[in-house]
């Protein structure tokens, strides 16, 4: 199957989902029992890249797109019969594979000064004011009246550009008590002698 002028997004998706992997997965999930007119890699591309932001697709529209991309003509029943629990499982496994592949590669690279570190973790806390009826459970730190406050503690990975942990505390909780250091941090430090 040949797409004209593939974009960067298509190239990225093609490296994450090679055609041979898609065919193997289709057989493994019983989406394809024997390959005839419905090709698993073509249906994958049509279902994933066949939608546009401002364009509403129908199943019939996807069928026409499939026929164009596969350069074949198929009957309506042959097309509609493919929308089965096996297709759902096939697409589900594709999503899991895609998430695993994206998690393998960090989104950012650290600068020269920080290249010896595996990751940089940033601790951030935000105070959210709550209704005064919650003051017993979430007392505020500095207040002359009865007030309630919630501290949202977030540890963010600079490399993955996403949260490592998220926790809720009373506003009175000290910052040092919100920092949870566990075994996950051991691989993040490198000692120099």
Each predicted region: which residue ranges?
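Conserved, well-structured functional cores that handle cations and Mg-NTP chemistry
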Residues: 1-193
